[in-house]
Amino acid sequence: MIKAFLHSINSVFLTHAIFIPFLIGIFKWKKIDSKFHPFIIYLGMGCLAEFLGYSLRTNGLLTPIVSNTKNFLYSWMAGLFLLEFIFRFNQSQNFRSIQLIFTVICWLILGIEYFILGLDQYRASFVVVFSLIFLIYFELDLIIKLVHHAQLRINKKGLFFILLPMLFFDIFYLIFSILCFYTDHYKIDTLLSNLQFGYIVYNFFTYLLFSIAILWFSKKINYLSQ
């Protein structure tokens, strides 16, 4: 019964849970380190994507073409802001080049997929999968650097309440996306249903952790130098 209830309010979890950390971030915008601002913008883009998806779906306007275009634009633009957030802490001098490489590959993949499949058939699936793999790599890289920093107190750093849930969330979503895009749904319908249930629950608690992390943010703190 609990599982059925959670499935029945799927749209509530996915559409509204992300608004919690975003609104907290907007409220505390001037009080938190500017290094976290790209992450707040990333959450805002997620809110916009979920709101548009929900509005289009309820009005019968979410056609495959519209849905795939929305997925592509979100994967690309949200990825750019998430990369900027990561590299503000990674202290890399090449992050603009990496953002450019990310953009070029996303659009190149889209162009190839569109050329091969056409407007009616392309799904932006390769872009979604590529962006997740790309982001997972740099999220993991920053986590490893933070862990190896001798003076970092993990349990007191709000940054870890963003990076760790985000890493597991992206890995989970990557697996789910690959199964959805590249397998026969009829053969693994039960598995996909269970994964979706897990996605709903984890998605909600991830955004709660993001909210806690934002509340812990303090101004002008260099998390790599303390």
Regions found by a protein language model. Name each.
Residues 2-226:
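Terminal, non-globular segments
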